[in-house]
Structures are given as C-alpha cells and as structure tokens.
C-alpha cells in the first residue's frame, strides 16, 4: 500500500517531475478556503520532505507548477491527481475533493521527496460521511492544541466529521454545580475548534447526552430529583458507566434538555445534532416504574426521543441518536422526523451483520459505528479494532449506510491515550473510503511508513503484539478496589485468574515486543521517535499492573512493586499532561495509591 486510504485507480505514466526553484503552488481563481488550506499544507510538506520552499499564488499555472483546481467531471468528494514531466495537477469535484487530492499528493511527497514519478490517480469515497468520535467525558479532556492536532490527522486521512462525546464536560451557563468537576470545555473552546475543523473540511458535530448517561448532572442537589433512581450512588467509574437516566415522566425533564441543547447548538456550524439517548439502563426502574408499565418500553422510550428529535429538527438541524435501544423495535424509526440518522454501534471483533440489516430493512438512515477498541487498555488491541472496523464498514456498504463513525471511548477513567488510537483511526478512514480489503499486516506496515515515517514498516505491527501481554485488565483492578471499598453491590473475582505464572509469561512476551520497538527507532524519522517514550510508558503500565494483579491475588506484600508503580505513574502523568488538561487524572491516582498501600500491607484490611 502506497497511500492511506488506497486510491480507487492508480496508473503509472512515463517520466517524472522534479520540484525546482521556479515551482509554484497555484490556486485557480474558482477555488476557495479549503484549497487555500491544501496549498498551505503542501507548502509545509514540500519544505519538510522535498527540501524546497515553494511559494503559493493564485492564477494560471505554468509548466513546472503544482496546480490546484476544480473539475466538473468527477463524483462528489472525488479528485484526480496527475503528475507528468510538465508539472502536477490536483483537480477536485468540489472543495472537499480537492483537499482530499492534496492529502494523497502529500503522501506521495513523503515517499518520494522532490522527484515525483509520473502517474495519474482517480479516486472518490464509497461513504460520503466518514467520522471519528472521541470521548471527552470519562476522565480525559484534551487540550485545544491536541484536538487541533487530531483534526489535522482526520484531514490527512480524508475523514470529514468529528464528534466529541460530552455529558458534564461543557461549561453550561446555568449548571454551576458541575463547575466543581473542573476543566470543562468552554464556548470559546468549541467555537475555536469548529473554525479549525471547518478550515480542514471537517464537520464538528455536537454530541451531548440528553437522556441516559447523565450521572454527574443528576447527582447534584439541584437536579437529583430528576434522576430515575431515588438513592444517590457514589461517583465511581462503573457507576458513571451504568447510571444515571433522566426521569422523563417528570414534566421538568424535557424543558431542561431542550434548554441544554439550545445553549450549545449555536456554537457549531454543523446542521446536525447528536442527542445520544443510548444505554438508558435505569429507565422505568424506580420513579417512572408505573408510567413505563402503563405505556410499555417502546412508547415510553420513543416518546422522549421523538420529542428531542422534533426539537432539533424545528431548529433546522438533522437529529442523530444511538441505535442500541431502537434495535428492539426498529419499525419505531418511522415515528421520528424525516432524515433522522440512527447511529448503529457494535464493537466486537466478531460483530454480526444482523443489526445493520435489521435497521436497513426498517428504512433507517444509518451510520455504522465501530470502535478502535482502546477503552480500558493501556495500548489498544489493534487486531480487535481492525476486525471490528473492517466488518462494520462492509456491513454498512452492503446495506446502504450513509456514513461510518469510528468511536474512541474512555471507559473507566480514560487510561487510553488518544495518541495510541491513531492506527484505529486510520483503519476507519481506509475502510470507509474504499472497498480494498487490506490485510491487517499490510495496513499496519503502511501506517508505520506513512504516519510514523518508519522505513522498516514494523512499528505498528509490534504495537499490535502488545494485545497478548495483558495478564490483568484495568477494569478488573477497578472492580476489585470498588468492591473492597463497599462501592459495588456484587463481588468480582477477576483477579483470582491473575497468577504469577501468567504474569511472568505475559511480561516475557512484552519484553520481546518492547526490545523490538526500541530496535526500530533507527529506521524512524527523528520527528516521530518521540513516540517511543509514550509506548514505553504504556508497556511499563501493562508490565507493572500484571505484577500488581498477581501479587494482590496471592495476598502478597511487595513494597518494591508499590514504589515501582508510583514511579511509573509520575511518567504517566507527564504523558497525560503533554496533551490533556488535568481533567480527572486524580481518579487514576486514587487507584494507584490504593494498590500501592495494599501492596505494602500484603492483604486487605
């Protein structure tokens, strides 16, 4: 694979083109702002990888120039890239297509420098909506600079939509009880990111919880009476995942959600709005039990979703919502406003086609929504992510989905660094763009070369091997701690399976992988070698927590391991703070501290 995503058609031509002193990047008169973005990106790429400072101008291209122009004979978002001895032409069906063509040219320049082999590429996407969905709620809120860097990556791999998952991490003007949680995104943050994304052809779509997953809001004094559950629950990582759902039988519920939606909607250019409405686990469990029993789950759930979608539509926006609940009664989709998009999620590496087929048969306008599978992991299980994304993309194309939204969640404190999700991001970009069924190894080698500038093509394949190094999973450690502290109703014996033998076996495999990663650094460009330290921090996390799990399962004291865990966390904090706000890093510190103390006393007590 020479390009990511793989072009539809590539034809070699005779000769080559040399970037020279008189080469110019020429914007044709009819081009707009996205073309200007592309020109600036090309200028930077040429300086870095071809060694030439190439000026940008607007007008008619001459021999020896790089021309950026529009062409009416191409499909939506399509482009044509031609390199011949007279120069380079990137033609786009529209501004988006032109920018996509520039990304392919950037990758060609990375590979070839100032001497470009003659060729012609004709290309267009299979799915017009290709997105990435980032959790900024469950512990980790990236700095604005990191979100902009993410937008740059989306643009480079021809993704055109970004959604940020928000529950309580936006600074609502009236919800002041949430301010104590700290580091929330502000209106200015969102508007600045929206501008940045728009300049790169990316639609920043608002995504705000408005039914389930409202734990922090419904735990406040002011809004606890709107919670479905009557008793307060401790703010633990598992509880945040499972609770709280809005009591929609309360007449105050709908106006509150409408007001929250209305406050954030104007911050975005997008004419879409994701109300979420997923995993309403507590629906009808306590305060609205009688109402649910009276009308039934379908009418009760869909009634509120219909009200929210209607409100969004009245505001001139296209509603979106997660489709896990409506899967139980897909014919109810007909009750929603025309054009409502159902977000069909499924994250298993063995995900089946049934849900996608069922929604298509019900007439749903749907996105397929796989996941990078990095949540709860120090390093994402790349094989699982690849298999899941590949399958879901294929199902979507087969059953007429209009888009793919690749998810990156942060369950249980968001230990997974977004930097490590990049291979999964690319998997989604590749399978949403084209039909090429790239093998796992082939795709990883291409990502190694294109993203990490690794001439050996090995680094991503080695990262994938870390999936086999876990003897003890993070969620097991969290469950064990919460149960011991009386914050879970049922016990978890998951640590019982973590033995010294298993930890030793996994850590021996991990040591081999880390040694091989270190050996790859001479083949990497100096600008990407800094990733090695981040990968080592993740590898050390896996190694140490394997040992912690085994020691705790055996009831063994190990003060040296406790100290090693605390030293590692200092490195982890540095990695976190390089790209993220402080957010809820303290929650992870609580887990580290609890286990360090347990290791020093050898048993619970």
Predicted regions and their residues:
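Conserved beta-strand edge residues that scaffold enzyme active sites
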Residues: 60-61, 168-169, 210-212, 326, ...
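Substrate-binding cleft of carbohydrate-active enzyme catalytic domains
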Residues: 128-323, 335, 341-343, 396
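Contiguous, structured surface segment used for ligand recognition
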Residues: 1-130, 391, 414
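A generic structural motif
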Residues: 30-31, 138-140, 348
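Substrate-binding groove of N-acetylhexosamine-processing glycoside hydrolases
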Residues: 1-14, 18-21, 35-39, 81, ...
């Amino acid at each position: 694979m020479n390009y990511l995503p793989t072009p539809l058609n590539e034809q070699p031509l005779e000769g080559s083109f040399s970037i020279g002193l008189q080469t110019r990047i020429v914007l044709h008169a009819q081009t707009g702002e996205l073309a200007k973005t592309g020109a600036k990106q090309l200028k930077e790429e040429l300086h870095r990888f071809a060694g030439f400072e190439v000026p940008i101008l607007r007008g008619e291209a001459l021999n020896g120039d790089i021309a950026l122009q529009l062409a009416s004979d191409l499909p939506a978002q399509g482009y044509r890239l031609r390199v011949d001895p007279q120069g380079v032409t990137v033609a786009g069906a529209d501004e988006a297509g032109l920018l996509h063509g520039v990304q392919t040219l950037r990758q060609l320049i990375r590979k070839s420098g100032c001497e470009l082999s003659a060729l012609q590429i004709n290309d267009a996407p299979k799915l017009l909506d290709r997105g990435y969905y980032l959790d900024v709620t469950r512990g980790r809120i990236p700095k604005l600079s990191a979100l902009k860097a993410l937008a740059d990556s989306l643009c480079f791999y021809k993704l055109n939509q970004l959604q940020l998952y928000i529950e309580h991490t936006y600074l609502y003007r009236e919800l002041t009880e949430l301010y104590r949680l700290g580091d929330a995104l502000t209106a200015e943050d969102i508007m600045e990111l929206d501008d940045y994304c728009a300049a790169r052809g990316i639609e920043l779509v608002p995504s705000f919880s408005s039914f389930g997953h409202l734990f922090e809001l419904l735990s406040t004094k002011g809004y606890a009476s709107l919670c479905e559950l009557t008793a307060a629950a401790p703010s633990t990582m598992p509880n945040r995942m499972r609770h709280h759902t809005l009591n929609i039988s309360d007449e105050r519920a709908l106006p509150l959600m409408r007001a929250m939606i209305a406050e954030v909607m104007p911050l975005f250019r997008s004419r879409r709005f994701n109300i979420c409405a997923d995993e309403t686990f507590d629906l009808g469990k306590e305060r609205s039990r009688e109402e649910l029993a009276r009308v039934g789950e379908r009418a009760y759930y869909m009634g509120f979703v219909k009200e929210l979608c209607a409100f969004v539509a009245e505001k001139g926006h296209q509603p979106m919502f997660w489709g896990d609940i409506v899967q139980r009664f897909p014919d109810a989709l007909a009750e929603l406003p025309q054009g409502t998009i159902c977000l069909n999620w499924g994250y298993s590496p063995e995900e089946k086609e049934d849900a996608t087929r069922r929604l298509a048969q019900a007439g749903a306008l749907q996105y397929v929504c796989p996941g990078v599978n990095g949540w709860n992991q120090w390093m994402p299980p790349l094989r699982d992510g690849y298999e899941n994304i590949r399958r879901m993309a294929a199902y979507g194309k087969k059953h007429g989905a209009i888009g793919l939204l690749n998810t990156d969640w942060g369950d249980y404190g968001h230990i997974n660094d977004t930097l490590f999700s990049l291979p999964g991001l690319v998997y989604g970009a590749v399978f949403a763009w084209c039909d090429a069924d790239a093998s796992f190894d082939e795709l990883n080698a291409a990502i190694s070369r294109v993203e990490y500038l690794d001439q050996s093509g090995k680094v991503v394949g080695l990262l994938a091997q870390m999936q086999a190094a876990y003897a003890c999973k993070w969620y097991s450690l969290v469950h064990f701690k919460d149960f011991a502290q009386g914050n879970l109703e049922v016990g978890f014996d998951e640590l019982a399976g973590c033995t010294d033998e298993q930890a030793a076996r996994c850590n021996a495999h991990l040591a081999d992988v880390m040694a091989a990663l270190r050996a790859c650094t001479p083949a990497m460009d100096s600008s990407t070698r800094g990733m090695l330290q981040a990968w080592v921090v993740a590898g050390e996390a896996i190694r140490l927590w394997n040992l912690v799990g085994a020691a705790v399962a055996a009831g063994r004291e190990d003060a040296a391991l406790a100290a090693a865990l605390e030293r590692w966390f200092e490195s982890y904090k540095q990695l976190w703070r390089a790209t993220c706000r402080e957010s809820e890093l303290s929650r992870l510190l609580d887990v580290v501290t609890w286990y360090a103390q347990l290791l020093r006393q050898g048993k619970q007590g």
